[in-house]
Regions:
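Append "and occasionally in soluble cytosolic enzymes with long acidic Gly/Pro-rich linkers
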Residues: 214-221, 296-383, 387-388, 448-450, ...
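Gly/Pro-rich hinge or "lid" segments in bacterial periplasmic/extracellular proteins
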Residues: 64, 166-225, 347, 351
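Surface-exposed binding/hinge segments that line
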Residues: 90, 127-180
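Alpha-helical secondary-structure segments
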Residues: 27, 104-111, 145-151, 200-201, ...
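N-terminal lobe/hinge region of extracytoplasmic solute-binding protein
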Residues: 29-82, 113, 195-199
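Long beta-strand-rich cores associated with HINT superfamily self-processing modules
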Residues: 497-522
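Extracytoplasmic/peripheral linker and loop segments enriched in polar/acidic and small residues
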Residues: 302, 391-402, 407, 416, ...
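Ligand-site clamp/hinge motif
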Residues: 190, 218-263, 391-393
Length: 522
């Protein structure tokens, strides 16, 4: 433990040492201020969710090379159960948690049950099954030590059910270890904020909030990861991250601005890796905000679509790192809309505002993450909206604070991303186009958009088994949100990551924001 503390201190004390990173350790510079918890039942931020993929395993996963396909992970195979709304899973007989405890069907049942009962941010994904506190106990049947039957009451097919089980919230935790660390019936949630109990390639060795996260190779993992240790170094400033990667003080650097990426492309000691991403970026209005009723006026939503200078954002400000995208399904997903019906048109926006009774000088606050590209985009939005005499007050905050504000509806407007939790159109439709009384606190709930009819259509699309009909339903859902909603989808990103040349075998999934650490070599 002393050596690990020393390791954290080494990269936390000074940037002037310029020491080469250890051969058995990957050092990554990335902001860590968005992390709230490492409990897979609660984690819902990009960095912590991406860490989940390296420390926990699900029954199945999206294939790393072809994410439209499914690959076995903790389950060696699966088949239909006793009804069309059930599946039988057979577990790997030799899988073990980092504690040495074997992975059993009881761990699977415990993990999914606790996620439903904790009812944290990502629990709405499992709610797609129709699972509730009241019925979850009756949804599983143990067939033998390595086989269980899972069922669900919701009208969804087996393919969507499998996709839901690839999300981090469906990760399998070590029930014995977690229960040993439970306090006041919290299912071990408090302990898992800063610890891990998984069967993935790595385990959490040490975490210092906002400063460093140390992952150590899980000695029980099979196969073993190529490196012994991963150090995520919390570096809040993008300029400092660029300096660290140039000096060789870190091996990988994330969240660099367009100008920094351009400059690093000329450095012969490193390269820029580009990975496809499912992240879509949107402007959202809190329609329930009492201080500014204009936010609930559809005229403002409509005008906003014509006050975003999409071309300038994508090509000039962000230098092509982000493409124009105006629908909630990301490019690459089945049925994603590729059209771009909106462009920058101040005169049209003014006309819409006037007809809708939005007075000149209308003002609202825009909450954004205090990192690129959010600050840059927010300033551009502030300037473009001002041309129509709509005043935006910028409120940059740490990422963790932004998520807390969103979940508490404590904001007026927001510019942020949404990433797919699994590779299926339902992952984004259930966020942008679903909000029912007493239901999950989706994105539509967070902006206070009451949509009973649209929510019903979202459920219909989720349960449709005919591929062509399902695609048509998602097209209609996208068009509705695209044309008339408090969401203005603007961009889709591609992950551009600076990597030192001595680092190889780097790969990143479409739905995550960090590398798969188990394959990385130095």
């Amino acid at each position: 433990m002393r050596s690990l503390i020393l390791l954290v201190a080494l990269w936390g004390s000074s940037f002037a040492l310029h020491a080469a990173t250890p051969k058995d350790t990957l050092v990554v510079a990335v902001p860590l201020d968005g992390i709230i918890s490492f409990d897979p039942a609660e984690s819902f931020e990009t960095v912590s969710n991406s860490v989940q993929r390296n420390i926990y395993q699900t029954l199945v996963e999206a294939d790393r090379n072809s994410p439209q396909k499914l690959s076995p992970l903790l389950a060696t195979r699966w088949q239909q159960g006793s009804t069309p709304h059930s599946l039988i899973f057979t577990l790997k007989p030799d899988a073990r948690f980092s504690s040495g405890n074997p992975v059993t069907v009881q761990d699977v049942i415990f993990s999914l049950t606790r996620a439903v009962q904790l009812n944290k941010a990502p629990s709405f994904i499992l709610a797609e099954f129709g699972w509730t506190n009241e019925n979850i106990a009756s949804q599983f049947k143990v067939l033998n030590d390595h086989q269980l039957e899972m069922q669900w009451p919701a009208q969804i097919g087996q393919n969507l059910a499998l996709r839901l089980l690839t999300a981090p919230v469906a990760s399998v935790v070590d029930s014995k270890t977690v229960q040993q660390n439970a306090v006041n019936n919290d299912f071990g949630n408090g302990w898992l904020h800063t610890h891990s109990a998984g069967s993935g390639a790595f385990t959490i060795q040490q975490y210092v909030p906002q400063q460093a996260l140390v992952l150590s190779a899980n000695q029980q993992a099979n196969p073993q990861p190529k490196l012994k240790r991963i150090l995520l170094k919390g570096v809040a400033d993008a300029g400092a991250r660029r300096l660290l990667i140039q000096q060789g003080d870190v091996d990988v650097a994330y969240q660099l601005g367009p100008d920094q990426i351009d400059a690093l492309k000329r450095d012969k000691n490193l390269r820029i890796e580009a990975f496809p991403s499912s992240l879509v970026y949107y402007l959202g209005f809190n329609t329930k905000d009492k201080a500014q009723p204009a936010l609930g006026n559809p005229a403002l939503w409509q005008a906003a679509r014509w006050l975003v200078d999409y071309q300038s954002l994508s090509q000039d400000l962000l230098k092509g790192q982000y493409r124009i995208h105006q629908s909630f399904l990301p490019q690459g997903f089945d049925g994603a809309l590729e059209d771009q019906p909106f462009h920058y048109d101040v005169a049209k926006a003014k006309e819409i505002l006037a007809k809708g009774g939005i007075k000149p000088g209308t003002k609202f606050a825009l909450t954004v993450i205090n990192q690129p590209p959010y600050i840059d985009v927010a300033q551009a939005l502030q300037a473009s909206f001002a041309k129509a005499d709509v005043q935006i007050e910028l409120q940059p905050v740490a990422e963790s604070e932004l998520w807390s504000k969103m979940r508490g509806r404590d904001f007026q407007s927001i510019f942020i991303y949404w990433g797919a939790d699994y590779v299926d159109p339902n992952t984004n439709a259930s966020a942008f186009a679903y909000n029912v009384p007493g239901g999950s606190k989706t994105l539509a709930w967070r902006v206070g958009w009451d949509i009973p009819d649209l929510s019903a259509k979202t459920r219909t699309a989720a349960g449709e088994s005919d591929a062509a009909k399902r695609r048509a339903l998602y097209t209609d859902l996208q068009k509705t949100v695209q044309q008339n909603s408090p969401f203005v989808v603007t961009l889709q990103g591609a992950q551009q990551v600076a990597v030192r040349n001595n680092v190889s075998h780097v790969q990143q999934g479409i739905g995550v924001s960090l590398l798969f650490f188990d394959t990385v070599q130095k």
